[in-house]
Amino acid sequence: MKFRVVHQPTANAARSPFRIVEQTAGREVDWINRYLDYECLRRVAPLTLRSYAQHLLHFVRWWESVHHTDVIVGEALTESTLLDYVRFQSAQQPPFSGSTINQRVAVADRALRATFPDAPKQVAPEFQVSYWRRAPMGLGRPMPAVSRLRVREPKRTIVPLSVEDVARFWSSFHTSRDLAIVGLMLLQGLRSQEVRDLNRDDLRLPEAEIRVPGKGNKPRMLPLAPEAVQLLDHYLRLERPDDPTAPLFVSLKGPARGARMTPAGLRSLFRYHRHTTGVKRANPHRFRHTFASDMLRGGVSLPALMRLMGHAHIQTTLIYVHVTPLEVYQQYARAVAQHIRPIPVIPS
């Protein structure tokens, strides 16, 4: 059997537009689609819902290859079901990354627990961490708990773009729209999805403010850098169709002229300019890291940077912090010179 994800737009807010179906007969995989409907009812973002569907598609393909059916009953689940799924992924060539495996296992675990609450708990001591869970509302003693099954992920360090790389990449753009897009990523730290989701009425150029439709339906107001105001003003005056209600960044030519820029269009834009300039690491997320590093060097505090970047937890912001050994030395020397008083006398 072959399975795939289909997109079926619907006005029903309780039904997921993403469905897992058996490709030959068009039959839906009921237990997965019930879980996707549940997540849709929780109002998760469409991209998150699509990601869940893709992860569960991979899981059901594995399950069918082992059990020769996509139907799951509670009795078929064992304590090692997810561990067997991890073994399968780890044996593939080329191997999947630890983060990909963990994301798939986490989604499959949530879906199975929601659909089959009486199924055996997954047990794999080498892949789980024991901890104490707080009692509800902080009343009563903490209870022992076990984390979800996870494989170890190597720590990744994303190095920001250098000044030279940014200048070379920037110089290859010629339209006001493209310059404004890159400017919002570099000067404001916006995600690619946030840039695409902007509407014309999100801009308040006289006040130098922008309303960002953040990740997880969490909008935030941000101040605009003077350079960003200038780039956006040029785009609005010179290139964008005059429609105050339309999307901010639109296609400028072809049959889709005036329609919101698509993810494929944005990826194609960056791919073309990476090839043109030779700056192979230039992508929207790398510009976001570059923004975070520039803000820290400029003296912005971590709590303020967390708000600027739209993070819910400061631990997420710390991932974007990249400080070179030279910067550590310089900041330490400056702090010692400014704040250690009196300077101790060193005997000769």
For the regions a protein language model found, what residue spans apply to each?
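C-terminal secondary-structure termini that scaffold catalytic or DNA-interacting sites
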Residues: K2-F3, A335-S348
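Flexible interdomain linker/hinge and immediately adjacent N-terminus
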Residues: P120-R168, P213, L252-R257
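Basic, Lys/Arg- and aromatic-enriched nucleic-acid-binding interface segment
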Residues: V159-S192, K218, D243
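C-terminal catalytic core of tyrosine-transesterase DNA break-rejoin enzymes
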Residues: G183, R288-A312, I319
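Conserved tyrosine-mediated DNA breakage-rejoining catalytic core shared by Y-recombinases
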Residues: Q188, Q193, D197-L231
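Active-site/catalytic core of tyrosine-dependent DNA strand-transfer enzymes
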Residues: P226-V279
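Catalytic-site neighborhood detector that most strongly recognizes the C-terminal catalytic loop/helix
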Residues: M309, I314-R334
